[in-house]
Amino acid sequence: MNVTLRPPLTTAPRRPDGAGSVQVQLDPNVVIGTAKVFSVYGKGGIGKSTTSSNLSVALSKLGKRVLQIGCDPKHDSTFTLTKRLVPTVIDILEQVNFHAEELRPEDFVYQGYNGVMCVEAGGPPAGTGCGGYVVGQTVKLLKEHHLLEDTDVVIFDVLGDVVCGGFAAPLQHADRALIVAANDFDSIFAMNRIVAAIQAKSRNYPVRLGGVIANRSAATDQIDKFNERAGLKTVAHFPDLDVIRKSRLKKCTLFEMEPSPDVERAQNEYLRLAASLLAGVEPMQAVPLKDRDIFDLLGFD
């Protein structure tokens, strides 16, 4: 039997996934300081940016200095606050070849409606790197320029229900994590995954669950059922009001809409939520359910 031996490979060894691109580099010594910090999570498309922006305005209406940080490559978190898609931190860093010392605050911080300060962290190109690096660099830049010293509240608006170490990076800085959810199975299933991620992060960081924001839902029976089993509580409820959808289309927050009963109703709920968060939200010791248990709990009989 003739045996042909394959010649040894002479090509360079395979590079690790994401090599040469932006990678997560979290510095445990970089902390935000005295500001109250909230991270907003939820299923993709559930209305986190709309919720975050209106909450930021509500907090500013109560006299607080607010900074909203968008943590999504779409960089549209602060769209209704600034009325445009502002450049991201990653875009600005690339322009100076990642020499952060060359940046000025006005290069990456933009003032939005009612004085809310806005930053879009952005993210690496699709399929490469880790968004956690950008979050870490954003917080580092803000601290280096002493911008966090003049801030009372920081809102992180985080990409979808991605709970990898990178996009869970805001949890390193947050006091409380808020989950936006609708009254449907997919949204609650995603919420359960987020609960698991927060539980994991809480072993090393002070972040705790602050509650559920029910959104785009006339009823909350399914959310209530999950909350009871998991140990959560709904802290605000925004029904599927058409004025909320229209505000996004008009590039504005609810606090800029023409007065109407529905607008006033939504505004008052945001102001109530903002006041309760400032007063202090007791941490919730939620326990995530197993996937099978969620199907049994919320599935068809």
From Swiss-Prot:
Top EC class, one word: oxidoreductase
Record's keyword annotation contains Acyltransferase: no
Positions with a binding annotation for [4Fe-4S] cluster: 130, 164
Biased composition (Low complexity): 1-13
GO molecular function (one): oxidoreductase activity, acting on the CH-CH group of donors, iron-sulfur protein as acceptor
Catalysed conversion reaction: chlorophyllide a + oxidized 2[4Fe-4S]-[ferredoxin] + 2 ADP + 2 phosphate = protochlorophyllide a + reduced 2[4Fe-4S]-[ferredoxin] + 2 ATP + 2 H2O
GO biological process, one term: photosynthesis, dark reaction
Gene3D superfamilies for this protein: P-loop containing nucleotide triphosphate hydrolases
Binding-site list for Mg(2+): 49
Cofactor binding note of this UniProt entry: Binds 1 [4Fe-4S] cluster per dimer.
Residue intervals passing through the bilayer: none
NCBIfam families on file: DPOR_bchL
Subunit structure: Homodimer. Protochlorophyllide reductase is composed of three subunits; BchL, BchN and BchB.
UniProt function note: Component of the dark-operative protochlorophyllide reductase (DPOR) that uses Mg-ATP and reduced ferredoxin to reduce ring D of protochlorophyllide (Pchlide) to form chlorophyllide a (Chlide). This reaction is light-independent. The L component serves as a unique electron donor to the NB-component of the complex, and binds Mg-ATP.
Family named by the database record: Belongs to the NifH/BchL/ChlL family.
Listed name of the protein: Light-independent protochlorophyllide reductase iron-sulfur ATP-binding protein
Species this protein is from: Bradyrhizobium sp. (strain BTAi1 / ATCC BAA-1182)
Name of encoding gene: bchL
